Amino acid sequence: MSQQPIRYEFIKACKQTGARLGRVHTPHGSFETPVFMPVGTLATVKTMSPEELKEMGADIILSNTYHLWLRPGHDIVKEAGGLHQFMNWNRAILTDSGGFQVFSLSEFRKIEEEGVHFRNHLNGDKLFLSPEKAMEIQNALGSDIMMAFDECPPYPAEYDYMKKSVERTSRWAERCLKAHNRPDEQGLFGIVQGGEYENLRKQSAKDLISLDFPGYAIGGLSVGEPKDVMNRVLEFTTPLLPADKPRYLMGVGSPDSLIDGAIRGVDMFDCVLPTRIARNGTLMTSEGRLVVKNAKYERDFRPIDEQCDCYTCRNYSRAYIRHLIRCNETFGIRLTSYHNLYFLLKLMGQVRDAIREDRLGDFREEFFERYGFNKPNAKSF
């Protein structure tokens, strides 16, 4: 059997928490885990250049199958030599399957065994996405890590519906494996579903593990459920997954959830959060959230975060950034996006160091104390 394109190397476990330090090897380089992956929906992390992403330490980014299928079209990306070539990014890329967008963006959708009928959210055209189509698109994009096409039920969902959905997702996963035509160049991850139901998560994990994917994602979280529900589901789901393969929690990017996810054995995370909140002037800092549009920063000439050494904090003041964001200047959005991405990438570096030094539990306590996450009714992002 040929070498898998995706390989997980376990480095060590934190004695204090059990969190894992590891490294994932891909055809476009390796990255240490736990890792946060910036999201480049349309083959760009909004307002950031590939050079800036490398400068801040990003070794893997995510792109969206659904959006690239609609614009510019996977055939055009393939003609360009694949996504890496198209967007001038020579490090690892993960693509999602398009499933989440079909279920979250489209008003009209009809789920059948074959796949999903839905309307294009841009122009209302009728479209159809199936496991086979999702593989065809991702094979054309040429990402290092592809995701199986799954059903993303809403939260909360009735048990009976969720059971049928999990069974369908397992059948679709098998079809994805059969349709995947570049298994030596691209790794395909299965997605464990099951909502908050422990026995359904067990069933989903068992089905997918029998198919022997090179990695596994935990889907159906960060869809509106309370944080304690997410943590509880992770506590019984991550131990079900093979220890010698990467585990990816989809759609999670708030600092508290990244730390809590790592403590529960997760290796990979992605979310649009840092860039989305940056566009309206909400910033992550070592002392908690900072909304730079607030009037109190009008004459505040300090950097966004005095503990931060990013390009934004080394060069610009809160007052200047407030002015740019209030005037809708693109440069303001670039500065806030840079800072938030840098903050999360640096946070994950601190998490990895804490695992290395067996002190992630202490790190969490200090961080939550500083951020105010320990207070009753604490506000996350």
Swiss-Prot record:
Its cofactor is Zn(2+). It comes from Bacillus licheniformis (strain ATCC 14580 / DSM 13 / JCM 2505 / CCUG 7422 / NBRC 12200 / NCIMB 9375 / NCTC 10341 / NRRL NRS-1264 / Gibson 46). Substrate binds at residues 96-100, 150, 193, 220. It is an enzyme of class 2 (transferase). Homodimer. Within each dimer, one monomer is responsible for RNA recognition and catalysis, while the other monomer binds to the replacement base PreQ1. This is Queuine tRNA-ribosyltransferase. The keyword Transferase applies. GO terms for molecular function: metal ion binding; tRNA-guanosine(34) queuine transglycosylase activity. Pathway: tRNA modification; tRNA-queuosine biosynthesis. Its EC number is 2.4.2.29. Transmembrane segments: none annotated. Binds 1 zinc ion per subunit. It catalyses: 7-aminomethyl-7-carbaguanine + guanosine(34) in tRNA = 7-aminomethyl-7-carbaguanosine(34) in tRNA + guanine.
